[in-house]
Regions:
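Hydrophobic beta-strand segments of well-ordered beta-sheets in folded domains
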Residues: 44-52, 100, 233-239
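Glycine/small-residue-rich interface belts in oligomeric ring/scaffold proteins
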Residues: 22-60
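ATP-binding/phosphotransfer module of carbohydrate and carboxylate kinases, centering on a glycine-rich
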Residues: 3-5, 188-259
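Alpha-helical scaffold segments in soluble metabolic enzymes
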Residues: 88, 92, 129-137, 183-187, ...
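Gly/Thr-rich phosphate-binding beta-strand-loop-beta motif of the actin/hexokinase/Hsp70
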Residues: 1-22, 139-164
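Nucleotide/phosphate-binding catalytic cleft detector across ATP-hydrolyzing
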Residues: 1-4, 9, 30-31, 53-141, ...
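Glycine-rich phosphate-binding loop plus the immediately following alpha-helix
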Residues: 111-141, 158-211
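A glycine- and small-aliphatic-rich helix-loop capping segment at beta-alpha/alpha-beta transitions
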Residues: 19, 64-71, 157-163, 167, ...
Length: 259
């Protein structure tokens, strides 16, 4: 049995190749033990684990977890709330003795179009898992936009990651988004931290409810349209909790079908 572990914004998700799956909130995952994987099948039957952890920004190749420095991240501080659940899961897997590998994020050290490297980070590793799934339907050239608490979009062309827009540089999600002038002023004045500004830049904090989904749809569509400049014929896929609600509007904005 093989298991994949996704370190998401709000939860950690666990899935096995037998079709079983479960998730834990990041808070609940602070109490994780390897025995929790019994929900997927006998622990002694696990032949290998692939996991994502945080930004994955200090390595560029799929790597055994016991070979990583600092769990594969430059620092656990940065854009997003640190809770400790993902750290606990990573450490429990590493200490279990079960063969395990980690998926890297996409960042300045990655082999992407150099023009995307104006920003230090492009996408966290779990988005590569989404892209892999999309490739089974759309082939080797496509754009995928993952829309939920934040919005991250990436371009795959001829089976290669060309680049991505991370959560803190372009389209907002429900909770997170880019820092605008007002946020920068508050940070400079010491009213909030930059991380607090990022985690409260989403539409739920700044717009009436009736405008929230249309706003995310427009900005996510703009991310997809921007990436289309580099691959005009790329198909477009949506992922994340908001995808079903926004698909029709995004398709209308782009004037092309999305899946």
């Amino acid at each position: 049995m093989y298991i994949g572990i996704d370190h998401g914004t709000t939860s950690l998700r666990f899935a096995a190749d037998n079709g079983k799956r479960f998730k834990m909130s990041r808070e609940a995952a602070k109490e994780f033990t390897i025995e929790n994987l019994q929900k997927l099948g006998p622990v002694e039957d696990i032949a290998g684990i692939a996991l994502c952890y945080s930004m994955g920004d200090n390595f560029t190749q799929i790597t055994p977890v016991d070979k990583l420095k600092n769990r594969g991240v430059i620092t656990r501080d940065g854009a997003g709330e640190h809770i400790g659940g993902g750290t606990r899961v990573f450490d429990a897997v590493r200490e279990s003795g079960i063969p395990a590998i980690a998926i890297p994020g996409i960042h300045r050290g990655s082999d992407t179009d150099p023009r995307f490297k104006i920003y230090s980070h492009q996408t966290s590793p779990e988005k590569l898992g989404i892209a892999y799934l999309v490739s089974e339907t759309l082939g080797d050239t496509f754009i995928v936009s993952d829309i939920s608490s934040n919005t991250v979009s990436l371009l795959i062309a001829n089976g290669k990651v060309i680049g991505a827009f991370d959560a803190c540089v372009f389209a907002p999600g429900t909770r997170h988004g880019a820092l605008d002038v007002d946020a920068i002023r508050k940070v400079d004045a010491g009213e909030i931290t930059a991380n607090e500004a990022f985690t409260t830049a989403g539409v739920m904090y700044h717009l009436e409810e009736k405008y929230q989904n249309p706003t995310v749809a427009m900005w996510a569509a703009m991310e997809c349209a921007s990436l289309s400049l580099l691959a005009p014929d790329a198909s477009i896929a949506l992922a994340g909790s908001l995808a079903p609600e926004l698909a029709e509007e995004i398709s209308a904005l782009l004037q092309k079908p999305v899946i």
